[in-house]
């Protein structure tokens, strides 16, 4: 097996101490030019590559930002990641992306991994409303910013849209189009986003003088296309089928759309569908979906920039207002 070249090998080849090699790498201005040239020549000749990660861990910090999302199969979170990665790269950082797959167990494991790797900070979309994993993560004193989730307390930072207003916008559109029987394909009830969008939908009905019974909820365990197809099948089985559907995200809406096509139901003639997120796939569907837009790339970039502000404030030992 080939020997991995270390700093001691460089020192031996250059005829200097390990400390001198370290100074050439980290503080070259403190080393005489002749000695510095000899060390650099040895580095080139031996092909030495310093262990940046080890150096950073010894210093108690990393140039990696953690990003934990609900579902990397959702184009919304792909766009969030793009925005976060761009902002991190501009700051000289990399991004470690992990997917909780909407599992609190996997979320806990990845947060533990981030702590073990001593990441600079974490961007996180929580899996549920309880915040148990977040509470456990706080003890590591690693800065974090919530993405697509409103912070509950005053000590946390978050980047999100107003999901109550978004839910109201979607249902107001359907009510204005004359619909008086609307289904809400909601997703997991533990997600704040799902609950807030439902609250907004009910607010829109109240504004229109309509009762809550106008909205019929069809919960799903996940926020993906397969769950949308299942909800669509349940919708088709209703005796008094609603004339419109509001879906908690676009993947659910695409699944409902597929179920309707398979059953010969015309969209939007027989059933109107409104999604949420305005992902590119929704606009490219056989029947382009109406959707509430979320600026995912911008949200990711803003969250990363906010996290960098948090880490800088922590390094400077000063309070940071947000």
Where are each of the predicted segments found?
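Alpha-helical recognition/docking segments in bacterial nutrient-uptake
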Residues: 1-2, 60-172, 176, 237
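N-terminal helix-turn-helix DNA-binding module of bacterial transcription factors
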Residues: 1-63
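Short beta-strand segments enriched in small/hydrophobic residues
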Residues: 18-22, 57-73, 173, 181-188
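Hinge/beta->alpha junction and helix N-cap segments in small-molecule ligand-binding domains
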Residues: 52, 69-79, 97-106, 132, ...
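Periplasmic-binding protein-like
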Residues: 67, 118-126, 183-186, 218, ...
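Short acidic capping loops at alpha-helix termini that bridge into adjacent secondary structure
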Residues: 180-182, 212-216, 267-272
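Flexible loop/turn connectors
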Residues: 233-234, 238-322
């Amino acid at each position: 097996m080939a020997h991995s070249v270390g700093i001691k090998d460089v020192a031996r080849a250059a005829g200097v101490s390990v400390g001198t090699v370290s100074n050439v790498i980290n503080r070259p201005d403190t080393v005489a030019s002749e000695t510095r040239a000899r060390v650099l020549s040895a580095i080139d000749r031996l092909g030495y590559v310093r262990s940046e990660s080890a150096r950073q861990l010894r210093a108690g910090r990393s140039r990696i930002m953690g990003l934990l999302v609900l579902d990397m199969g959702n184009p919304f979170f792909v766009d969030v990641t793009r925005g976060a990665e761009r902002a991190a790269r501009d700051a000289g950082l990399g991004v470690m992306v992990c997917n909780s797959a909407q599992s609190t167990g996997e979320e806990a494991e990845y947060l533990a991994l981030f702590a073990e790797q001593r990441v600079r900070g974490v961007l996180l979309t929580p899996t549920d409303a309880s915040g148990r994993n977040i509470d456990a993560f706080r003890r590591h004193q690693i800065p974090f910013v919530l993405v697509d989730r409103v912070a509950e307390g005053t000590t946390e930072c978050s980047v999100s849209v107003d999901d109550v207003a978004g839910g109201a916008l979607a249902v107001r559109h359907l009510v204005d189009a004359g619909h008086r029987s609307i289904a809400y394909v909601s997703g997991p009830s533990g997600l704040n986003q799902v609950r807030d969008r439902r609250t907004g939908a009910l607010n829109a009905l109240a504004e229109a003088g309509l009762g809550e019974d106008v909205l019929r909820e069809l919960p799903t365990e996940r926020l993906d296309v397969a769950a949308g197809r299942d909800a669509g099948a349940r919708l088709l089985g209703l005796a008094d089928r609603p004339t419109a559907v509001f879906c908690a995200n676009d993947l659910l809406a695409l699944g409902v759309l597929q179920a309707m096509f398979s059953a010969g139901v015309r969209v939007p003639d027989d059933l109107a569908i409104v999604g949420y997120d305005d992902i590119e796939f929704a606009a490219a569907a056989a029947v382009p979906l109406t959707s509430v837009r979320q600026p995912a790339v911008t949200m990711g970039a803003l969250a990363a920039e906010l996290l960098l502000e948090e880490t800088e404030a922590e390094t400077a030992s000063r309070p940071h207002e947000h």
